[in-house]
């Protein structure tokens, strides 16, 4: 997979397949990470209001535009996301304006609905129930209403709009209601969660997939994918065959791009930022070994298990069966 490879969105804009993710990037690190990524050659940045670091990301972008020879704003594909407390239609454009102000930018390349879940409106990103154990949901606004507001955002402020963490049911509903197909669906995806029915649906509809948590995570007591024996064996095997060092991270990122998908690894160390951007080709044996990991699917990001709990069933996993609510698709 080529580090400079792009795919074309249904809006006609090109999105680089490898992006630089900023989730869980600590203040004091993320600005330097963004600068380093742009210096190395990344041209796709993935951000969100809820990450709490957009101001610093904006400073990293500004520094890169000033110091990386020839780099212009239009060379960088910048994604951000609408947070759950701003799902009321009248709150959508002000939330976009707030993100643009934090970043010091005039426009975004892509704006996503972060989750198909509305929280109680207001300044608090995580409004809590009285006892603090749950996030306060707003069941009086639907994802169809929010999506309609997204599609009506001025093109001068955002070039393409999309969604994140949407299932086939959610996508069907917003497309049917508005006739507008999201440009992107950003989802948890890795060899342990291949999610083939959703991938096939999005391919049929012309929706590009962006994978987050590409390396998995260790919330379930499982090792990170990059630390798993199976992925290490694939990397070792490819290293011998290709006569160069192939790392487990590069293996996962190459797998994530098969079929024209995009992926947004996060790192704040210079060596890893560069390593994640290197081109690696997988052979059929490597792909088969990685696909085997998905025979028993494992999802890591389940809001019902978060603290405070989101009392909502989004993905119909065993963990969510006790949830009191589902996504409000339409009212």
Curated annotation (Swiss-Prot):
Reactions it catalyzes: glycerol + NADP(+) = L-glyceraldehyde + NADPH + H(+); glycerol + NADP(+) = D-glyceraldehyde + NADPH + H(+)
Catalytic center residues: 51
Keyword Flavoprotein included in the entry's annotation: no
InterPro entries noted in UniProt: AKR (IPR020471), AKR3B (IPR044490), Aldo/ket_reductase_CS (IPR018170), NADP_OxRdtase_dom (IPR023210), NADP_OxRdtase_dom_sf (IPR036812)
Pathway(s) where this gene product acts: Carbohydrate acid metabolism
Keyword annotations of the record: Carbohydrate metabolism, NADP, Oxidoreductase
Pfam families per record: Aldo_ket_red (PF00248)
Molecular-function GO terms, alphabetical: glycerol dehydrogenase (NADP+) activity
EC number of the protein: 1.1.1.372
Binding site for NADP(+): 213-276
Sites where the protein binds substrate: 114
Keyword Cell wall biogenesis/degradation assigned: no
Gene3D superfamilies hit by this protein: NADP-dependent oxidoreductase domain
PANTHER family: ALDO/KETO REDUCTASE
Family: Belongs to the aldo/keto reductase family.
Cited function: Mediates the conversion of L-glyceraldehyde to glycerol in D-galacturonate catabolic process. Also able to reduce D-glyceraldehyde.
Name of this protein: D/L-glyceraldehyde reductase
Organism encoding this protein: Hypocrea jecorina (Trichoderma reesei)
Gene symbol of the encoding locus: gld1
């Amino acid at each position: 997979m080529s580090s400079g490879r792009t795919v074309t969105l249904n809006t006609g804009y090109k999105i680089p397949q490898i992006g630089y993710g900023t989730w869980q990037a600590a203040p004091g690190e993320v600005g330097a990470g963004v600068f380093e990524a742009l210096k190395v050659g990344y041209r796709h940045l993935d951000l969100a209001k809820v990450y709490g670091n957009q101001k610093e990301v904006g400073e990293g972008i500004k520094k890169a535009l000033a110091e990386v020879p020839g780099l212009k704003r239009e060379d960088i594909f910048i994604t951000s996301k609408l947070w759950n407390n701003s799902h009321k239609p009248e709150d959508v454009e002000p939330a976009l304006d707030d993100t643009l102000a934090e970043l010091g930018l005039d426009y975004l390349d892509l704006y996503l609905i972060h989750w198909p879940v509305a929280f109680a409106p207001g300044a608090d990103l995580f409004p809590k129930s009285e006892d603090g154990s749950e996030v306060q949901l707003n069941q009086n606004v639907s994802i169809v209403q929010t999506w309609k507001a997204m599609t009506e955002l001025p093109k001068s402020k955002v070039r393409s709009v999309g969604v994140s963490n949407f299932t086939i049911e959610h996508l069907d509903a917003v497309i049917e209601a508005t006739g507008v197909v999201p440009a992107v669906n950003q989802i948890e995806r890795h060899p342990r969660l291949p999610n083939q029915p959703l991938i096939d649906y999005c391919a049929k509809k012309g929706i590009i997939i962006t994978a987050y948590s590409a390396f998995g995570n260790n919330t379930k007591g499982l090792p990170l994918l990059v630390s798993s024996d199976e992925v290490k064996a694939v990397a070792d095997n490819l290293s011998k065959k290709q006569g160069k060092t192939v790392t487990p991270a590069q293996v996962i990122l190459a797998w994530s791009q098969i079929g024209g998908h995009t992926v947004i690894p996060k790192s704040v160390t210079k060596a890893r930022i560069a390593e994640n951007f290197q081109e690696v080709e997988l052979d059929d044996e490597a792909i088969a070994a990685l696909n085997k990991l998905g025979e028993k699917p494992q999802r890591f990001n389940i809001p019902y298990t978060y603290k405070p709990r989101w009392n909502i069933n989004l993905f119909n996993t065993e963990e969510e069966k006790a949830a009191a609510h589902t996504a409000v698709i339409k009212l």
